[in-house]
Amino acid sequence: MKKVILTGDRPTGRLHVGHYVGSLSERVRLQNSGDYDEIYIMIADAQALTDNAEHPEKVRQNIIQVALDYLACGIDPEKSTIFIQSMVPELTELTFYYMNLVTVARVQRNPTVKSEIKMRNFEASIPVGFFCYPISQAADITAFRATTVPVGEDQMPMIEQCKEIVHKFNSVYGETLTDPQIVLPSNKACLRLPGIDGKAKMSKSLGNCIYLSDEADVVKKKVMSMFTDPNHLRVQDPGKVEGNPVFIYLDAFCKDEYFAEFLPDYQNLDELKEHYQRGGLGDVKVKKFLNKVLEAELGPIRERRKMWEQRIPDVYDILQAGSEVAEKKAAETLNDVREALKINYFDGDFALN
């Protein structure tokens, strides 16, 4: 069996550092490992329209922004197929067939769906398309016969529901779909990066993000305004590192070599945490260090993005070529699904009498 990756993002805005540590950096690592036969990276515009139906121009504008972020982070179109979801109509048809295998009650129990509904204040006014998001995602994953899906922690319930659909389909219609496996970031701090305001999730809609494309001065301003331990009022006060966004970001981004370069008074992050916990280390000093760490990580990404911004026609070509490759792959799976459902009425031995 081929080893295949499928992953992607909704084009509702530029990508942020939560995307980077939660999934993007892992995609680049897996892409460059040479361990996978095919890699598909989807710009999920159709899914983005489920809660932006009245503002399609927002989705359209952000397709290029997301593509630029992908390329800037190191996604290589020679190794990975970058495509636009709506350019692969087979995904919509697969979604429709899978809907028959899932109950409304099951979708309502999906923790990701529940949290997204609450965050957007949908309640009873939830669009049907948004409600069916987990089923659409299952179509995306199975269409490319993905064996591996690198995701952030918040997407785990979606992948679990996809696996349920795969098992149900295969048990009813015969072995047809590939059962995907989840890959989470190895660094636990990367599972879910909090917002700079200390809220549980960094989110474009909450406005608490550091974007990959933010200029250095913007990143610095955001870092210096970050939420920390509210009880750490004076430098000499003992501070708390658990749940402290500044230290969570350092857990996610910091490398030992950054101490030698930016903060030689400490050997590693454990020493810095120890000092903060016993008192005598101010938030400003820690934030300044975090800002230098982020600049070391984001600076090269920002420069590559600026280079690609000068090559927008090439970015369009990459997306068009990738979408064509993706459609061919999805068409193969859809044909197998139709055959399993016995609805390929005019094909060979299955033709209507």
Predicted regions and their residues:
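N-terminal Rossmann-like or analogous alpha/beta NTP/dinucleotide-binding catalytic cores
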Residues: 2-139, 257, 296-298, 305-306
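Short alpha-helical patches at coil-to-helix transitions and adjacent helical residues
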Residues: 20, 24, 91, 155, ...
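Internal, conserved structured core segments that host functional sites
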Residues: 111-115, 119-169, 173, 194-195
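Conserved nucleotide- and phosphate/pyrophosphate-binding catalytic cores
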Residues: 157, 163-353
